[in-house]
């Protein structure tokens, strides 16, 4: 259930951990290409956003956002409650809650220093360590949850339906696919065009003072280009764009996971380890019993459940990696591929920041 980049990246992180512990060497990674690969992948996702998919995914966006809000609140309640049980500052519990789980390293870097200013010692370290833990666990939990749902509920998958109109994500295993330089060049051109226009869009967004992921501009531009081409009946090299996007996702995840500082987890005291395990159990139970049922109890819902594990314990790319692993084995689910990045990029950061701020004021 796990993609090769995830396994390879984690193995390299373990090697770095060994070198760190034994003081044999210190490796510093150059992650210059990480954002490029991330932007390329999400631009490819934007090209799937035709009006037809938007129409089908409209209500799903609202539903998935509602589920994400409930998850945010649940994570913060669990974190603060367990902190009180261990006689720790409940604000420190928030560092193992949505600050680091659904917020990831970005939110951890924002709220950690703020909590330290409020007198919570070690908040930044705990936030980053928890986010690192979540990044690792989100990938593992997502696979187990989805496999359990598909097996236990005997869900019908696209590959089982033998419906040739349903695209399969794992294009590189399509034995009938023909590699064509012209189509690859056109697909690359569409991606580069969307990324160029997207950089301008992202610049305008930054000028407003709002905080968005760097890839959102490229994804919006790609969606506009896709729908313009649909209206003008201009052919889009969908398969080639998808392949380039999936390759970029693999490289991005590998680089990101290679840079994990696993030794940061050693600095966590037993109470914090217990809180992180509790967050992992919460995520698995939440995805299995709430996300799956709320999103329709079908194959798409299982993909949503798997994505929510990566999304709820790390970052949107982790969620997409979980979906990609499922799509490669069982078939493509179009709606989750569009809904999850949109919710993760456009809405969750705002809601999460508001909920965290509310909890901070309540617990102070």
Q: Where in this protein do the model-derived segments appear?
A:
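Hydrophobic alpha-helical transmembrane segments in multi-pass integral membrane proteins
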Residues: 17-21, 76-84, 109-115, 251-264, ...
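Alpha-helical membrane segments and immediately flanking helix-loop junctions
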Residues: 82-126, 133, 145, 298-347
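Entry/N-cap segments of selected transmembrane alpha helices
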Residues: 36-39, 51-80, 188, 258-288
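Transmembrane alpha-helix boundary signature
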Residues: 17-28, 46-57, 77-90, 231-232, ...
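Small-residue-rich segments of transmembrane alpha-helices in multi-pass membrane proteins
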Residues: 6-16, 65-77, 98-103, 223, ...
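Structural signature of multi-pass alpha-helical membrane transport proteins
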Residues: 1-31, 47-50, 170-173, 185-240, ...
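Intrinsically disordered, low-complexity non-transmembrane regions of multi-pass membrane transporters
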Residues: 147-188, 230-235
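Structural signature of hydrophobic alpha-helical transmembrane segments
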Residues: 28-42, 91-98, 209-221, 244-245, ...
């Amino acid at each position: 259930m796990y993609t090769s980049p995830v396994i390879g990246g984690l193995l390299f992180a373990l090697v770095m951990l060994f070198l760190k512990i034994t003081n044999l060497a210190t490796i510093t990674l150059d992650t210059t290409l990480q954002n490029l690969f991330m932007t390329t992948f999400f631009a490819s996702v934007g090209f799937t956003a035709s009006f037809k998919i938007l129409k089908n995914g409209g209500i799903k966006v609202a539903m998935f956002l509602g589920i994400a809000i409930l998850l945010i609140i649940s994570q913060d309640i669990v974190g603060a409650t367990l902190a009180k049980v261990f006689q720790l500052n409940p604000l420190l519990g928030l560092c193992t809650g949505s600050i680091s789980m659904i917020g990831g390293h970005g939110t951890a870097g924002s709220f950690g220093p703020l909590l330290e200013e409020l007198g919570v010692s070690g908040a930044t370290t705990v936030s980053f360590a928890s986010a690192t833990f979540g990044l690792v666990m989100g990938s593992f939990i997502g696979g187990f949850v989805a496999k359990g749902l598909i097996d236990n509920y005997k869900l019908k998958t696209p590959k089982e339906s033998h419906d040739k109109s349903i695209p399969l994500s794992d294009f590189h295993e399509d034995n009938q696919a023909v590699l064509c330089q012209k189509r690859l060049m056109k697909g690359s051109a569409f991606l580069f065009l969307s990324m160029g226009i997207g950089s301008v869009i992202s610049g305008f967004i930054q000028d407003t003072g709002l905080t968005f992921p760097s890839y959102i501009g490229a994804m919006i531009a790609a969606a506009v280009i896709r729908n313009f081409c649909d209206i003008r009946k201009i052919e889009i090299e969908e398969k080639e764009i998808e392949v380039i996007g999936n390759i970029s996702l693999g490289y991005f995840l590998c680089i990101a996971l290679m840079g994990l500082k696993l030794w940061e987890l050693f600095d966590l005291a037993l109470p914090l380890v217990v809180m992180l395990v509790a967050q992992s159990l919460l995520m698995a139970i939440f995805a299995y019993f709430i996300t799956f049922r709320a999103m329709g109890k079908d194959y798409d819902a299982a993909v949503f459940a798997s994505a929510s594990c990566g999304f709820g314990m790390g970052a949107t790319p982790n969620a997409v990696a979980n979906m990609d692993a499922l799509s490669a084995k069982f078939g493509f689910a179009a709606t989750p591929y569009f809904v999850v990045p949109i919710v993760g990029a456009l809405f969750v950061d705002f809601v999460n920041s508001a909920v965290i701020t509310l909890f901070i004021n309540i617990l102070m």
